[in-house]
């Protein structure tokens, strides 16, 4: 079990770093929109920005939202490299959650990866609006023998 948990947390951390790194490939247009290489845009002045709640506490996530679709997956990155949130979903309706990386929350790196038996996640899609909910797992380095489980909710609109 410890090995599966370690793999899940490490995979989520790599996912967050990778997607956040990819999100820096942006160009700004004159209309105030950010366009990724894949053509997905996120308006920085949009009234309904991303919402991230972990363990019942609203997380103040700042930065852009970058959504790309490739190989049947929707990759969602929110925020920057240091505080980034990332998710990979299938592009079906309803989408299936493949992985979620929530980054470091109070000293615990939290994540979910399907197929590991650790945590759970589900997603709904309404147009370009996604809602991802579940339970992420992590390791508190102050007590590494005791896995940490925290509920999460992510709401984001890809445009």
UniProtKB/Swiss-Prot annotation:
* Effect of deleting the gene: No visible phenotype in culture. Grows less well than wild-type in human monocyte-derived macrophages (MDM) over 7 days; increased human monocyte MHC class II expression, decreased interleukin 1-beta secretion from monocytes and MDM. No growth in C57BL/6 mice over 40 days, even in mice lacking gamma interferon.
So which domain of life are we looking at?
Answer: Bacteria
Pfam families, per database record = Myco_19_kDa (PF05481)
Where is it predominantly found?
membrane
Question: Low complexity: which segments have biased composition?
Answer: 27-49
Changing residue 22 to A: reported impact? Protein not released into host cytoplasm (uses recombinant M.vaccae to infect mouse macrophages)
For this UniProt entry, the molecular function terms from Gene Ontology, in alphabetical order, are: host cell surface receptor binding
**Which intervals of the chain are annotated as region Prevents bacterial uptake by a human macrophage-like cell line?**
41-60
Renumbered to this chain, region (Disordered) spans 24-51
GO CC term (a single one) = host cell cytoplasm
User: How would you describe the post-translational modification of this protein?
Assistant: Triacylated with a thioether-linked diacylglycerol with C16 and C19 on Cys-22 and an amide-linked C16 fatty acid. Modified by Lgt on Cys-22 with an S-linked diacylglycerol with a mixture of C16, C18 and C19 fatty acids (palmitic, stearic and tuberculostearic acid), signal peptide is removed by LspA, modifed by Lnt with an amide-linked mixture of C16 and C19 fatty acids, expressed in M.bovis.
Instruction: Read off the PROSITE patterns from this record.
Output: PROKAR_LIPOPROTEIN (PS51257)
What's the protein's topology in the membrane?
A: Lipid-anchor
Induction remark: Expressed in cell culture; expressed at a steady level for 4 days following infection of human mononuclear phagocytes.
Please list which residues make up the signal peptide: 1-21
Q: How is it used?
A: A disrupted strain immunizes mice against subsequent infection with wild-type H37Rv as well as the M.bovis vaccine strain BCG.
Write out the entry's keywords from A to Z.
Answer: Cell membrane, Cell wall, Disulfide bond, Glycoprotein, Host cytoplasm, Lipoprotein, Membrane, Palmitate, Secreted, Signal, Transport, Virulence
Positions of N-palmitoyl cysteine lipidation: 22
Q: Which family does it belong to?
A: Belongs to the mycobacterial 19 kDa antigen family.
Note on domains (UniProt): Forms a U-shaped beta-half-barrel with a large hydrophobic cavity.
Report what the protein is called: Lipoprotein LpqH
Organism (species): Mycobacterium tuberculosis (strain ATCC 25618 / H37Rv)
